[in-house]
Every structure is written in C-alpha cells, then in structure tokens.
Amino acid sequence: MRVLGVDPGLTRCGLAIVDELSGKKVKLETVMVFRTDSEEHVSQRLMKLDDAINQVIKKFKPDVVAVEQVFSQHNLKSVMGTAQAAGVAYINGAKANCEVVSYTPTQVKASV
C-alpha cells in the first residue's frame, strides 16, 4: 500500500510518500514541502497547492491520502489557512479515488 501523508498548511504544506512493505515495515519514498507566497491572494495560494497535490498524486499514485487533522490554535487566520489546505488535500484524494483518512498529530507521531 502506498500512502500520501499531508501535513496541511497554507504557507508550508508537508507531503510524504510512504510505501508499506511486508509486516510493519515502511519505506519513505519521498518527502517535500510545498510553499506559497504569503503576499499572494489566498485563492491563488490554494490553486497552487491544488496543482501541487494533484501532480504528486498523479506521479506517485497513492492508495490512501492521510491528512493530519487541524487542531485548535489561538491564531484564527492560521487555523483557517491550515483547514483550507486540508480541504484541498481531501478533494484531490477523493478525485483520485483514494481512500482519504485523517489523524491527529499525536497519532501521526506515535505511528512513526
């Protein structure tokens, strides 16, 4: 099974491709950080993130898209951008007929 892990963010969005090998062994295929310019309008930033995630899905063909859940922060603007980026990942996964799941940051750290 191949998983695209997404640590959503509007300024920096972490993407990783992980392959499940036999048993509980996994192989990190690639990791990348996609950045957008905070000077650009949010619609342009989301469109660029959409294009980037779409290209990663086309290139690596994951079975599952795992999105880290947005947790409550004090900065509402930051939470909104993170939630919007997560939504882009959800939509791209669904369009590619991938299983889309979400995990808390604690669950992600415990599994690595």
Per-range role (PLM):
Residues M1-V112:
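Phosphate- and other anionic-substrate recognition elements at nucleic-acid/protein interfaces
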